[in-house]
Each structure stands twice: as structure tokens, then as C-alpha cells.
């Protein structure tokens, strides 16, 4: 993880206490995400399809920081519904097995004795009683199922 914090952004505003000439070359931005090897590629004769594929992968990577997150610019939480919706696109393109193994360990850590899971994993305690439904906490079944389909890993 970054030493302090990270944010997704499109524009940067710089404020100074006195007039300063600042060129864009003076600023550095980093595209940060978990280091997952690329395993898939799509190239078509349609440049629009190629751009959509690239944008999908950039979106997936920008939301991969220790676990799948919901967005790179605000909450950056492991919303379970968002996580299981993106797993197929992710695994077709990246070897992210260790990311999902770790996230499943987080699931086991957060699961209450009665089986209840929170909507955000990992959580600081929020999301256990929100009743978002099975579509959110179904990650406990959908993530292992997709890991099995892509890797043949039945553990």
C-alpha cells in the first residue's frame, strides 16, 4: 500500500502562496495497483472494441489494491457485490489468484459465528446488518467457484 494514501483522479490543481511557473513536466502521477501478471489479450479489427477492452482492464486494475475495491477515488472499500461482478473480467486478463485467495481469507475472518457476512470485506465493523441480500454476500460462494473454473483449484 502507498505510504500515506492514494486517490484516483483525472485533473490536478496546484495552489501556491506566491506566483509560480509550473509546467506539467513538474508533476508526476503513478498508476498504482497490485502486481498481477497479464494472462489474456484481445485485439480486434475494431479500434472502438480495443479501446473498450483496454478501459475495462484499466478499471479493473485501478480497483485492485490488496482486494477488489469499489472505486479508486473515494471509498476504496471491498464491497462484495462489486468484487464478484468483476472477477471474470479480471481472471480472463490477469493471474489474480493470490488476490482472491487473500480476499477469501478476509471473508473467513469477517464471517460471524452464525454465518453472516458484511457487505464490505474487510470491514471495521460496518455492514453486518444492512440486509443488502445474497447478491452481495454471495462472494463466499462465487469467488471460490470462479477460482475453480479458471484455475481448477478445488480447495
Could you tell me what each predicted segment is?
Residues 12, 56, 86, 107, ...:
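Conserved hydrophobic/aromatic pocket- or pore-lining residues that grip, position, or stack substrates
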Residues 7, 22, 47-55, 78-85, ...:
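Generic recognition of stable, solvent-exposed alpha-helical segments in well-folded globular domains
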Residues 1-51:
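Extended acidic/polar, glycine-enriched regions
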Residues 48-51, 55-70, 115-116, 125:
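Active-site-adjacent substrate/metal-binding segments within catalytic domains
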Amino acid at each position: 500500500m502507498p505510504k500515506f494514501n492514494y486517490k484516483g483522479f483525472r485533473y490536478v490543481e496546484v495552489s501556491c502562496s506566491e506566483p509560480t511557473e509550473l509546467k506539467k513536466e513538474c508533476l508526476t502521477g503513478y498508476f498504482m495497483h497490485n502486481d498481477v501478471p497479464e494472462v489474456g489479450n484481445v485485439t480486434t479489427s475494431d479500434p472502438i472494441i480495443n479501446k473498450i477492452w483496454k478501459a475495462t482492464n484499466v478499471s479493473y486494475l485501478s480497483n485492485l489494491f490488496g482486494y477488489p475495491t469499489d472505486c479508486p477515488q473515494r471509498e476504496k472499500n471491498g464491497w462484495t457485490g462489486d468484487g464478484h461482478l468483476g472477477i471474470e473480467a479480471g481472471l480472463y486478463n490477469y493471474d489474480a489468484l493470490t488476490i482472491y485467495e487473500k480476499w477469501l481469507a478476509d471473508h473467513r475472518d469477517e464471517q460471524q459465528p452464525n454465518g453472516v457476512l458484511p457487505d464490505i470485506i474487510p470491514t471495521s465493523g460496518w455492514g453486518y446488518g444492512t440486509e443488502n441480500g445474497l447478491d452481495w454476500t454471495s462472494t463466499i460462494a462465487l469467488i471460490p467457484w470462479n477460482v475453480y473454473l479458471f484455475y481448477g483449484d478445488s480447495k
